[in-house]
Amino acid sequence: MARLNRHPQSNIAYAVRSLRSKGQLITNSAPTQNASTDALAVNIDHRAILTVPSYRSSVRVFQRSPCLHRAEGLLSPYCNRGSERTNQGNRGSAPSKILLPRTIADPFRGGPE
């Protein structure tokens, strides 16, 4: 797992460099629920997904749950209630507040449903 420190920008830069060098960077070009944000999804060791909105300062980390990285390699935001962490602390989140699209396909495991 990539090392993380207290500075979100450093974490993002380190994760992107590390994953790009391993060929594991997954970028998400699908529109998000908020049209003003483009999220970059980064898969770190199949343990967490960082979403890095382009125009916001917050960084959301989705902890591994039974619905992350299912056999099809998809992520469903409807499975993540209560598992979202932000840099403002822990809080449960309704699906409408999640910045990810409905599914993110893992190119190494197949396409969306």
Swiss-Prot record:
Location of region: Disordered: 78-113
Domain of life: Viruses
Protein name from the UniProt record: Uncharacterized 12.3 kDa protein in repressor 5'region
